[in-house]
């Protein structure tokens, strides 16, 4: 935060983005200031709930919703959890793109169904897609206007339904609809080609270096490999599904995991195959209304 002082008097408090040549000239030349006052907001309490509420001793907040579009300068870009006794009964996102909010909510909803959400399982059909999915690190009026902030709190005994209710609320109050749908989708399936165990770890320190060169997994589960392959499209744009049924920890080494053909060839030494097929997969589908 920046404090503006002139002639020994406090003029304003702002964020650093407002420190520009034109803003400084306005102050020096005693012109009408375009500065927007920024006062730090406490994210640990319900977002923008008046402190007057704290003086009411005979009432207890049961639920709370705050939802806004456009950058809030007094808040950072991030997220916050409202928790009690290990249960999350509220979630806060500040200055995020809708895609970032959707993916975080989707991750929780997929986990509740025993699945793992990846970028390859998110289908953005919005036109143009940049309305909800853009680089939030670029700060300008256009991107600031597309940022959203939400604080969504449910009664503590309804914590299990937090994310489904949160998504429903966002669907009702934006021009878009997000749903979890099973769709038959092209994918790559990891399979074992024999009953011989060529995967079992010899022990030692757990190493997750799958995306490095050379690629190394030591004393780790296959889930590390699947997660890394699904994290981006560097190896393939297709989702990777594990159908090996192998639950133990493994030792694996590859020369170049960014080249699909090389990876498939080197998987064979462990009696593994990565084959293209189709499967009904749970997808996070985002549509215009």
Regions flagged by a language model, labelled:
Residues 10-31:
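Non-catalytic, surface beta->alpha helical segment in thiol-disulfide oxidoreductase systems
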Residues 1-13:
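A short, hydrophobic beta-strand/beta-hairpin element that forms part of a small beta-sheet core
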Residues 30-289:
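Beta-strand-rich assembly/attachment modules of structural machines
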């Amino acid at each position: 935060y920046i404090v503006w002082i002139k002639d020994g008097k406090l003029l304003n408090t702002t964020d650093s983005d407002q420190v520009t040549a034109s803003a400084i000239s306005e102050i020096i030349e005693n012109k009408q200031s375009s500065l927007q006052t920024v006062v730090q907001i406490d994210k640990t309490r319900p977002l923008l709930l008046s402190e007057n509420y704290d003086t009411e001793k005979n009432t207890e907040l049961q639920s709370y919703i705050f939802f806004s579009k456009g950058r809030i300068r007094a808040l950072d870009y991030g997220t916050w959890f409202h928790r009690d006794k290990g249960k999350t009964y509220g979630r806060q996102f500040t200055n995020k793109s809708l895609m970032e909010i959707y993916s975080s909510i989707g991750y929780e909803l997929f986990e509740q169904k025993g699945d793992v959400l990846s970028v390859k399982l998110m289908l953005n059909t919005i036109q143009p897609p940049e309305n909800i999915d853009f680089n939030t690190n670029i700060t300008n009026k256009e991107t600031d206007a597309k940022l959203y902030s939400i604080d969504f709190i449910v009664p503590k005994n309804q914590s299990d339904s937090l994310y489904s209710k949160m998504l429903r609320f966002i669907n009702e109050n934006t021009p878009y609809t997000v749903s979890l749908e099973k769709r038959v989708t092209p994918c790559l399936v990891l399979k074992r080609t024999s009953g011989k165990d060529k995967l079992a770890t010899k022990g030692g320190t757990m190493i997750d270096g799958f995306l490095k060169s050379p690629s190394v997994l030591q004393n780790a589960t296959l889930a590390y490999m699947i997660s890394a392959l699904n994290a981006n499209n560097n190896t393939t744009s297709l989702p990777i599904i594990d159908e090996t049924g192998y639950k133990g920890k493994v030792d694996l080494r590859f020369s170049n995991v960014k080249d699909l053909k090389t990876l498939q060839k080197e998987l064979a030494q462990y009696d593994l195959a990565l084959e293209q097929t189709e499967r009904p997969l749970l997808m996070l589908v985002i549509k215009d209304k």
